[in-house]
Structure formats: structure tokens, C-alpha cells
């Protein structure tokens, strides 16, 4: 997409933040309007995260106008809201390539721009990193400002509060901005509150506040009186007691869509010492009515026609694996009142919308709190219930100690429904589900299942749910199922694989939903094909049979080769002194960048042609 200078005359003047800071302040509202329209035009053509960026246009302009970026360091949490930031920092003409193979990264990425201070993708990391960056700048004697922008969802995570608690203790010079888009701007976020924010962030108030603390620090009754008086004055309009108690100077809430007001407040706060906290209120989807009305649907969008205000409907094809899981969940809950479902803020993505409506008293969205989600599930299991934790592979990493310490060691019957396992696609390195088999396989008493299709997925969910001797995990990919017939639910024998095709000389041991590709290769090479089903416990007997009956084995999985299912097969063969050649095929030892799932699999040699080529090259 070429940039239309006539359509965006003010934005055309801004190819860097240095150029932005040369603009007269009175032109900034027009810049914000053009930036918002350009974002709509670009994302509707290319797909991507959408509603969050619409809500941070004024904040982004104000931050880069007031702070000397990239010398001053600006950190975005998660990064969904950072598209305007990318546009203003030299990547305007490439924004249409975002999330595409070889294009702009979907999130702030250190290797892409000096303006991207922290590579992100997972939530709630910004304040911790910001403290470290601020401390480093202070120790180096650099007069560098540090600003972290975090959303109202991300700030609920324990890591964010751990960081704020630490900041209150060591008191680095830094600013945390809470982008609160949970509700539309209410009346109290108006002229009075904006005036108060500028007053409280001004040098006079700050000097009086800090000077008063020094003068009266040794006089406890007066110190306490001053503190209570200050809290009383601010408490009339400022809901910031929690952040003040953590050691921050709280300012807000202020209108996050008033670019002139934001600039005034940020200029006042820029030179304040110690940890500062600015609370701004924004509207997700701001400026595009369909996104304002339905910010969840418009959070991340495919290509669409902005004039219609409608996203393209599903073609009505095969259901996704998340839908398969959600249907199984509802079906099981209707029969068993002990089922409890838990998600860390991924209701829509995990296919749990219908369940949350039908069984609200058994649905628990714990917010962005993966560690809590797992230990909460452990508590439910101790209480005699049957918890199912629906979680993305990449996010389960954040609760690894809880899986071991709070679930596995106690052999609690918690089932993990691991969505987005394997290659995820457009969200890139931070979201690929590349490691779950490796990091779960080494945990004692964990049962791990890898379905090859949607029917097997249902059977494994059923099997895991009724397994009472410890935790279980069923991992399934992002994307549509294969269209196989669904059969009545029944328990699978634990740790047993299934031979799908008998061949000669070569046996392919497949783990998971690469089965259709494996079947094509097995047919082409006249190889035996095995659906291994279980990564733990492995079917040792079947593995040894395949080794005895074939000249060579190939393992296939959409997980890191290192420590994955194939490594488990190698261990079985070595333990039994079977010197059969084995080729492990899976995800390589590097972080897989963005692109479609099909592009990634083709590039990594995980489509049928690539798998066959790998095997032939190995046999040559």
C-alpha cells in the first residue's frame, strides 16, 4: 500500500519523532485524526491488532512529542496498542506488512527499531524491565527518562504488582502510565480532573510535597497529619490509593484522548523524581464506531471493508480445535456438576464463550494470572472438583513452577487443555507453541496426549478428564480440524499408540496433528505409519516393535526437537540398546518468526513435501 500524501498531509510530515517534535502543538489534533484514519486504512487491508491501537493514538503522539525518544526510553506492555508507535517511528510506509512473513513484527521488537526498547508479546513485563532500565541509566549517569505504558488488563497480573512494590522500595525515576480502557470516559474525567492532574503534577505542588516530607519527617504527628490531609484532598477525585501505598505518586485519571491535556501533564511529570503513576482513561476502538461498540471482536481483525463496519464471516467450513474443545466442555459439564473451567483471560480464544454463558457458576476467568490459574485449579481438585485449565501453550510457560509444585507433586487430577500448540503463525516468536512437550515431558506423573484429529482430541479430553491419578495435558493446534467423523466418547488406554498403516523398512512415528502430512509421506515411501497418541507415558512396547521390524525410524512432531517426543523415543531405544537409526523431525533450534502457519511449515519442511525431502536426504 502506497502512502497517500494528499489524504494524510500532516502525517506525511512525520517520518520520525524528531520531525514530530518540530510540528506546532496546535497541529497535533489533526495529526491524531490522520493517524487514526491511516491505522484504519492500513489494518483493514492487511489484518492485525486493531482496537487497542485506535485507543492509544493521542497518548502515542503526546509521549513522542514530550519525550526525547529514542534517547528517552518508551516501553509498551504486550504491544497490541503499539501500531501508532510504529507508524510514528519510521515504519509508516511498512505498516501494511505487519504480522506477515518478512514484514513488520506484530509487537515492539528490539531487532526492528531503536525505538522498540523491549521486545514484547506476553503481558505485564514492562514495569519490571522499566525499573531495570531506569536503574541502569541512573548508574551510568545518563539523564534519560523511562516510561512504561501498561493496560488495565496487564496490570492485574502479579508480576506487575511485584514490580511496582519493588519500585516503591528503590524509588527509581520512572513513569508508569496505566491505559485504562475498561470503560468509556466518565464525567469525572473532565475539566476539573484534568486541571487537578496538571496541578498535582506541577513543580510547585511536587516541591511542596517533597519539601514538606523532609521538613516534617522527624515529627511523626505532623507527618501523619500531612499524609492524611493530602490523601483527603486527592481522594475526593483520585482513585489512586493503592498505587500511592505502593510508593508511587499517583496522578489521574485524565482524558487519554485529549492530546493537548496529555502533553501538559506529561511535561509536568517529566522531571519529577521517584516513581510516578499516570492514570489515563481511553476508549478501545476510539474513532471507529463498530470497534467502539464491540472492542473484543475488533481486537484483532482479518482484512475487512471499513465502510461496511462488518468483519468477514466464517466460511462455515470445518470447526476449529478451540470449538471442538468448547463443545466437549459444555457436553461434559451438562453431565457432571463437578467440572470447573478456568482460563487466564482467554475466553474467546479458547472457545469458552458458550460455556461461560451456560455454566457461569462453574466458569472462572482469573484474568492475566497464569500462575494463580494453575494453583487455583489445584485447590479445586483438593476440594473434590474436576478442574480443566484452558490455556495457550505459550502462556502455560508462565506457570511452570505451579504445574510442578502445586499440581504434579501432589498428583492432583487437573487437566490442562493446551491450545495453540505448535506453529501459531502471525504473532511470531513470542506466541509459537514450540516448547510444551519438552517442558512437560520431564515432569513425573504427567500424562501428555497429542491428538491427530478432532475425534481423537475429544477422546483424549474425555480420557484426561476421567484420569484421577495425577495431572493430564491434551495439546492441540490453532486452526481448523480435519473433518473426521466424531464417535461416542470412550477412555483411551493410557500410553498406547495405534498403527495406522503397515509398510516396509521405514516407520514414521507421528505425534499430533501433522498426521495428514505424515500419511501422504508414508504412502509415497511405503512406510509404516504410527499414531503414537501419548508423549508420556510413551508406548515403549510399540516403539521396540517398530525398531525390530524396520530398518529405520522417523519421529514427527510440531514441537521443539530438543527434549520433545522424538527425544523420548531416542531414550527408549538407547535404554534397550537398540541401535536403529532415528531421524527426529520437528521444530528447529531457533525462534520461529511471523507468517502464516502454511508458510512456516513449508519453510521448516513440515509439510508433506518437506518431510519427504528430509527423509530422502537423510537416507541418501
Curated annotation (Swiss-Prot):
Domain of life: Bacteria
Cofactor note: Binds 1 Mg(2+) ion per subunit.
Family affiliation: Belongs to the transketolase family. DXPS subfamily.
GO BP, sorted A to Z: 1-deoxy-D-xylulose 5-phosphate biosynthetic process; isopentenyl diphosphate biosynthetic process, methylerythritol 4-phosphate pathway; terpenoid biosynthetic process; thiamine biosynthetic process
Residues annotated as binding Mg(2+): 152, 181
EC number of this enzyme: 2.2.1.7
Protein encoded by which gene: dxs
Binding site for thiamine diphosphate: 80, 121-123, 153-154, 181, 288, 370
GO CC annotation: cytosol
Name of this chain's protein: 1-deoxy-D-xylulose-5-phosphate synthase
Stated role: Catalyzes the acyloin condensation reaction between C atoms 2 and 3 of pyruvate and glyceraldehyde 3-phosphate to yield 1-deoxy-D-xylulose-5-phosphate (DXP).
Amino acid at each position: 500500500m502506497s502512502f497517500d500524501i494528499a489524504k494524510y498531509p500532516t502525517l506525511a510530515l512525520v517520518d520520525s519523532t524528531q520531525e514530530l517534535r518540530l510540528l506546532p502543538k496546535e497541529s497535533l489534533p489533526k495529526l491524531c485524526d490522520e493517524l487514526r484514519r491511516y491505522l484504519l486504512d492500513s489494518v483493514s487491508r492487511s489484518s492485525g491488532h486493531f482496537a487497542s491501537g485506535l485507543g492509544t493514538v493521542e497518548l502515542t503522539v503526546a509521549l513522542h512529542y514530550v519525550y526525547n525518544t529514542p534517547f528517552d526510553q518508551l516501553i509498551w506492555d504486550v504491544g497490541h496498542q503499539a501500531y501508532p508507535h510504529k507508524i510514528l517511528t519510521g515504519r509508516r510506509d511498512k505498516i501494511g506488512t505487519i504480522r506477515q512473513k518478512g514484514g513488520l513484527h506484530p509487537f515492539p521488537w528490539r531487532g526492528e527499531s531503536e525505538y522498540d526498547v523491549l521486545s514484547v508479546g506476553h503481558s505485564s513485563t514492562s514495569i519490571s524491565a522499566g525499573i531495570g532500565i531506569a536503574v541502569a541509566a541512573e548508574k551510568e549517569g545518563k539523564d534519560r527518562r523511562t516510561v512504561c505504558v501498561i493496560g488495565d488488563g496487564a496490570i492485574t497480573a502479579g508480576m506487575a504488582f511485584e514490580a511496582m512494590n519493588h519500585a516503591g522500595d528503590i524509588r527509581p525515576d520512572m513513569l508508569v502510565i496505566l491505559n485504562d480502557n475498561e470503560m468509556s470516559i466518565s464525567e469525572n474525567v473532565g475539566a476539573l480532573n484534568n486541571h487537578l492532574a496538571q496541578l498535582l503534577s506541577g513543580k510547585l505542588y511536587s516541591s511542596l510535597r517533597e519539601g514538606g516530607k523532609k521538613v516534617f519527617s522527624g515529627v511523626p504527628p505532623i507527618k501523619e497529619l500531612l499524609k492524611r490531609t493530602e490523601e483527603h484532598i486527592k481522594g475526593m477525585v483520585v482513585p489512586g490509593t493503592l498505587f500511592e501505598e505502593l510508593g508511587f505518586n499517583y496522578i489521574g485519571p485524565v482524558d487519554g484522548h485529549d492530546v493537548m491535556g496529555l502533553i501538559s501533564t506529561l511535561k509536568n511529570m517529566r522531571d519529577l523524581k521517584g516513581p510516578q503513576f499516570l492514570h489515563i482513561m481511553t476508549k478501545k476502538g476510539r474513532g471507529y464506531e463498530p470497534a467502539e461498540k464491540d472492542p473484543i471482536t475488533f481486537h484483532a481483525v482479518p482484512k475487512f471493508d471499513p465502510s461496511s463496519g462488518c468483519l468477514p464471516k466464517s466460511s462455515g467450513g470445518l470447526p476449529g480445535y478451540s470449538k471442538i474443545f468448547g463443545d466437549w466442555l459444555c457436553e461434559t459439564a451438562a453431565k457432571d456438576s463437578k467440572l470447573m473451567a478456568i482460563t487466564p483471560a482467554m475466553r474467546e480464544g479458547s472457545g469458552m464463550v458458550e460455556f461461560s454463558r451456560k455454566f457461569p457458576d462453574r466458569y472462572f476467568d482469573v484474568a492475566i494470572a497464569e500462575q494463580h490459574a494453575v494453583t487455583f485449579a489445584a485447590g479445586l481438585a483438593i476440594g473434590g472438583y474436576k478442574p480443566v485449565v484452558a490455556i495457550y501453550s505459550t502462556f502455560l510457560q508462565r506457570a511452570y513452577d505451579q504445574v510442578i509444585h502445586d499440581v504434579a507433586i501432589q498428583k492432583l487430577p487437573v487437566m490442562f487443555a493446551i491450545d495453540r500448540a505448535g506453529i501459531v503463525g502471525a504473532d511470531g516468536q513470542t506466541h509459537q507453541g514450540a516448547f510444551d512437550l519438552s517442558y512437560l515431558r520431564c515432569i513425573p506423573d504427567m500424562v501428555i496426549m497429542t491428538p491427530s484429529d478432532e475425534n481423537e482430541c475429544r477422546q483424549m479430553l474425555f480420557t484426561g478428564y476421567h484420569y484421577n491419578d495425577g495431572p493430564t495435558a491434551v495439546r492441540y493446534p490453532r486452526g481448523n480440524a480435519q473433518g473426521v467423523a466424531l464417535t461416542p466418547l470412550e477412555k483411551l488406554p493410557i500410553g498406547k499408540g495405534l498403527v495406522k498403516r503397515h509398510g516396509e523398512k521405514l516407520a514414521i512415528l507421528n505425534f499430533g496433528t501433522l498426521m495428514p502430512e505424515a500419511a501422504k509421506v508414508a504412502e509415497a515411501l511405503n512406510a509404516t505409519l504410527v499414531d503414537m497418541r501419548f508423549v508420556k507415558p510413551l508406548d515403549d512396547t510399540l516403539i521396540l516393535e517398530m525398531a525390530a521390524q524396520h530398518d529405520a525410524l522417523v519421529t514427527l512432531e510440531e514441537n521443539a526437537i530438543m527434549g520433545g517426543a522424538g527425544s523420548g523415543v531416542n531414550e527408549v531405544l538407547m535404554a534397550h540398546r537398540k541401535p536403529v537409526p532415528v531421524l527426529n523431525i520437528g521444530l528447529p533450534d531457533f525462534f520461529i518468526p511471523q507468517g502464516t502457519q502454511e508458510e512456516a511449515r513449508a519453510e521448516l519442511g513440515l509439510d508433506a513435501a518437506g518431510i519427504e525431502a528430509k527423509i530422502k536426504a537423510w537416507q541418501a
